[in-house]
């Protein structure tokens, strides 16, 4: 059965890292007879330059028609001065919303070979393996009303709205419990229920959903405490479920526990596990075109795609094992390099993963 994947290289280092991910995907397709068809288009700044919009209508239709979307990265300083509604990031928000991608999965897994890359002591992070599940289409990033107004005294005031409906909370909570069931059977719901009305409803609905999952140990934590605990004792967590803004912040924080955001993939899924897959890192315009970016997060995003959307666990395992082999060989891109290891570029790292498959 043919599987159509929409490839969106994006901006900055996006095209470079995507080229390596496609190399790996092509090889694994041959080895496991997946029947993959690749379709290419643009998103973000590259789409603005080509279509005059960060997400063209025809691109959105291609995304809807595809079984999965693989994205590089979006954004760059050359688009900082354009209409805010046309900024690259708006294309990313729109495609997530239009495809109904409400669940963002961001693992923070520390490879043993990279234990020294973390800024925390090895005993604090060794064996780290947690998953942050972020609600992606609701909350303050999409809430209305929002804007800037001038008060009677002439002062400007900006305002945003943080709404969450019961159904939005229920579906992400259910996803959190399901993910915990596949892992260590622990779920920590992070909110700010001591201050925010939306968080009070969040906590109440999560408690209601918990009744259907008696085998899962549920805990609640305020977001400020969660940020502190991620640094103090991150291994206490298995799955964290939280809202859009809190998840945005905490997942970036958790990514650095591993030493390099260049190692971390992510998945954004709809109710049927159709998804968009992308590295956690940004477009890194400062190193774009130099051939030194780390492609491993994008390659590992391919593994997540095979696991969650296509249910090809063996193929996903093979990619993850190949990445481990390459790290065992001492190959490192600049962001994860240390004394005694071999520094390689983007293409060489991709080739090494292909060779290890």
Swiss-Prot record:
Keyword NAD: yes
Location relative to the cell: Cytoplasm
Kinase found in the keyword field: no
Assigned GO CC terms: cytosol
Binding-site residues, Mg(2+): 224, 248, 252
Predominant place of localization: cytoplasm
GO biological process: L-leucine biosynthetic process
Pathway(s) this gene product operates in, as recorded in its UniProt entry: Amino-acid biosynthesis; L-leucine biosynthesis; L-leucine from 3-methyl-2-oxobutanoate: step 3/4
Stored Pfam families: Iso_dh
Record GO terms (molecular function): 3-isopropylmalate dehydrogenase activity; magnesium ion binding; NAD binding
Binding site for substrate: 96, 106, 134, 224
Cofactors required: Mg(2+); Mn(2+)
Keywords: Amino-acid biosynthesis, Branched-chain amino acid biosynthesis, Cytoplasm, Leucine biosynthesis, Magnesium, Manganese, Metal-binding, NAD, Oxidoreductase
Spans through the membrane: none
SMART domains, per database record: Iso_dh
Chain positions recorded as NAD(+) binding sites: 76-89, 282-294
Free-text remark on how the cofactor is bound: Binds 1 Mg(2+) or Mn(2+) ion per subunit.
PROSITE patterns in the cross-refs: IDH_IMDH
Reactions this protein catalyses: (2R,3S)-3-isopropylmalate + NAD(+) = 4-methyl-2-oxopentanoate + CO2 + NADH
Entries under InterPro entries matching the protein: IsoCit/isopropylmalate_DH_CS, IsoPropMal-DH-like_dom, Isopropylmalate_DH
Physiological role: Catalyzes the oxidation of 3-carboxy-2-hydroxy-4-methylpentanoate (3-isopropylmalate) to 3-carboxy-4-methyl-2-oxopentanoate. The product decarboxylates to 4-methyl-2 oxopentanoate.
Subunit structure: Homodimer.
Family: Belongs to the isocitrate and isopropylmalate dehydrogenases family. LeuB type 1 subfamily.
Protein's recorded name: 3-isopropylmalate dehydrogenase
Organism: Xanthomonas campestris pv. campestris (strain ATCC 33913 / DSM 3586 / NCPPB 528 / LMG 568 / P 25)
Name of encoding gene: leuB
């Amino acid at each position: 059965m043919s599987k159509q994947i929409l490839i969106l290289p994006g901006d900055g280092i996006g095209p470079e890292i995507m080229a390596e991910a496609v190399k790996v995907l092509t090889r694994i397709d041959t080895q496991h007879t997946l029947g993959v068809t690749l379709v290419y288009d643009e998103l973000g700044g590259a789409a603005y330059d080509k279509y005059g919009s960060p997400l063209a209508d025809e691109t959105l239709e291609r995304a809807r028609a595809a079984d999965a979307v693989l994205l590089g990265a979006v954004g760059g300083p050359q688009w900082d001065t354009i209409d805010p509604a046309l900024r690259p990031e708006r294309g990313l928000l729109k495609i997530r919303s239009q495809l109904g991608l409400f669940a963002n999965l961001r693992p923070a897994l520390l490879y043993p070979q990279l234990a020294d890359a973390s800024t925390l002591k090895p005993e604090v992070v060794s064996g780290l393996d947690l998953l942050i599940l972020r609600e992606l289409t609701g909350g303050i990033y999409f809430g209305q009303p929002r804007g800037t107004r001038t008060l009677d005294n002439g002062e400007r005031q900006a305002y945003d709205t943080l709404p969450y409906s019961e159904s939005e909370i229920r579906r992400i909570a259910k996803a959190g419990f399901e993910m915990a069931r596949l892992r260590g059977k622990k779920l920590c719901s992070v909110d700010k229920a001591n201050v925010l009305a939306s968080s009070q409803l969040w906590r109440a609905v999560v408690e209601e959903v918990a009744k259907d999952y008696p085998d899962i140990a549920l805990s609640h934590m305020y977001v400020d405490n969660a940020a502190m605990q991620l640094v103090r004792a991150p291994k206490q967590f298995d799955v964290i479920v939280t809202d859009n803004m809190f998840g945005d912040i905490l997942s970036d924080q958790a990514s650095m526990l591993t030493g390099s955001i260049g190692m971390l993939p992510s998945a954004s899924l709809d109710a049927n596990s159709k998804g968009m897959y992308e590295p956690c890192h940004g477009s890194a315009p400062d190193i774009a075109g130099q051939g030194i970016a780390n492609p491993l997060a994008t390659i590992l995003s391919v593994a997540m795609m095979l696991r969650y959307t296509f249910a090809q666990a063996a193929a996903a395992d093979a990619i993850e094992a190949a990445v481990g082999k390459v790290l065992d060989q001492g190959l490192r891109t600049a962001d994860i390099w240390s004394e005694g290891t071999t520094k390689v570029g983007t293409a060489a790292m991709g080739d090494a993963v292909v060779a290890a498959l």
